[in-house]
């Protein structure tokens, strides 16, 4: 058995019938059901404890064998119809519906809609979408309701012109985050500046910014929430460092061949100290004078799902172009070197390099990749998703085909989605999942 959560449409129907009978008995004393405003029948309702009836016990007695999930298991693999330049939306939907903990949240009916007009709730529509994609229906799904709600809540994405998949991802997470209020009732967020909805629990990380005064070495620290990390590429207008010569080793599928830039290289650049220069002097809170300073970004808190965005589309005063530089990325990623606790520090004036000991809590596994083919003016989005633990599939709108790991790692890469291998057991947080579960 794969030890994953199971969604069974027959059991779901039995649960609805039992729940209906229970509600009739509780109608005079309970007000719980009347508070539910979700427009989808059976969605977001609180099920009572299932007590088996005599016929059900007889059926269970006649069917004692457990079902074993076959390697050809295809539930969840369903194409999406392109409604007119909507590949940017389809590829993100495939990545989100194959995000393990988000999938389990929606398929377990955890959403409690509190919007005055539930038909405008994007979370309700995503719940319906998850149910459609995991229904076992092999025919492509038409996500017209989702597109309509996106146009309503993110008007800058309205219309049939080409859009950016990364921009859609951030807009979708923002709307889902706003519509999730009510799902975290009674829970206390670990950070008072954040809510504790499923979007924050899965996607929100903490980005630490340290500004160091060059005169007194005083440090000003701020921590901001983030849903993704955008990374500069070689060949862009921003400066990039040359590759270190002689690095020819390979780690978990990430190439280190001279001349090839890796995801790790991009993360090193993202977290290296940056001199702000004389034109950007700031008033130091320690010495109370305007001084030059350095700025360094590191991760204070890692999200459950880490999304990396390569800045392939460059818009400057001189030109608009797409950067096609190949970036090697691994199947497994260790974020320990890029944590605030691992950054370079000075002790008695001497630079101390971090000791990057293995930390399983900071290790991630790749589960989705979004790619863009074509030019800045005319292109097409597709995605690779991991399914049934170690199988990969290419999602090209309505067409889904089997893919190899080599196909995935050789792809250009625009958005990379990594899932934590080990989840820290925290109260009222998302359930712990073993790596085998996704």
Swiss-Prot record:
Residues 78-421 form the USP domain. PROSITE patterns: USP_1, USP_2, USP_3. One of its GO terms (molecular function) is cysteine-type deubiquitinase activity. Keywords: Cytoplasm, Hydrolase, Immunity, Innate immunity, Nucleus, Protease, Thiol protease, Ubl conjugation pathway. It is found in: Cytoplasm, Cytosol; Nucleus. It comes from the Eukaryota. One of its GO terms (biological process) is protein deubiquitination. One of its GO terms (cellular component) is nucleus. The keyword Cytoplasm applies. It catalyses: Thiol-dependent hydrolysis of ester, thioester, amide, peptide and isopeptide bonds formed by the C-terminal Gly of ubiquitin (a 76-residue protein attached to proteins as an intracellular targeting signal). The active site is at residues 87, 380. Its main location: cytoplasm. Its EC number is 3.4.19.12. The keyword Oxidoreductase does not apply. Belongs to the peptidase C19 family. Deubiquitinase involved in innate antiviral immunity by mediating deubiquitination of CGAS and RIGI. Negatively regulates RIGI by mediating 'Lys-63'-linked deubiquitination of RIGI, inhibiting type I interferon signaling. Also regulates 'Lys-63'-linked ubiquitination level of MDA5/IFIH1. Acts as a positive regulator of the cGAS-STING pathway by catalyzing 'Lys-48'-linked deubiquitination of CGAS, thereby promoting its stabilization. Can reduce the levels of BCL2L11/BIM ubiquitination and stabilize BCL2L11 in response to the RAF-MAPK-degradation signal. Interacts with phosphorylated BCL2L11 isoform BIMEL; this interaction leads to BCL2L11 deubiquitination and stabilization. This is Ubiquitin carboxyl-terminal hydrolase 27. It comes from Mus musculus (Mouse).
